[in-house]
């Protein structure tokens, strides 16, 4: 069989470069406190300028809470076209329903493959190395303040 000669398709790297402004990535970061409680920091990162767009802190993330946070992260039709995320169970039906109503195309990564979401993992690693490894977090309010200062730095 003769192979068809068509226009060459673009590579994944070219696609990401061309659509970087329309892609955002999200992830949850676990932060231990001084009293050995676990806090969860929800981080939203824009691919275009690799800018921290939104963060929120909670003790118990739920699908409804994440749906509200994604609405607050992208108000007034500022939502990206694509949202890259991991396959955490906390992203439930309420969250995916909210993405559909906002017109965001959900792109979950493969299970157990954090390297498919490198920008979010790099942000979390940098946040830990530059900030959280040097600060003892007391409570949610303290973590919000630390993230506010870090977002100005990042």
Where are these regions (language model features)?
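Charged DNA-binding/catalytic regions of mobile-element recombinases
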Residues: 1-154
């Amino acid at each position: 069989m003769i192979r068809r000669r068509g226009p060459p398709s673009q590579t994944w790297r070219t696609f990401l470069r061309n659509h970087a402004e329309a892609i955002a990535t999200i992830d949850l970061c676990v932060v231990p406190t001084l009293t050995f409680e676990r806090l969860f920091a929800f981080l939203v990162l824009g691919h275009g300028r690799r800018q921290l767009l939104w963060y929120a802190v909670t003790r118990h993330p739920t699908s409804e809470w994440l749906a509200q946070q994604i609405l607050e992260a992208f108000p007034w039709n500022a939502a990206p076209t694509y949202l890259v995320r991991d396959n955490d169970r906390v992203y439930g039906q309420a969250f995916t329903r909210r993405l559909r109503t906002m017109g965001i195309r959900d792109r979950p990564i493969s299970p157990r493959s954090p390297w498919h979401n490198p920008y979010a993992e790099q942000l979390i690693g940098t946040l830990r190395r530059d900030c959280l490894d040097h600060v003892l977090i007391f409570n949610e309010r303290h973590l919000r303040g630390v993230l506010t200062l870090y977002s100005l730095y990042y």
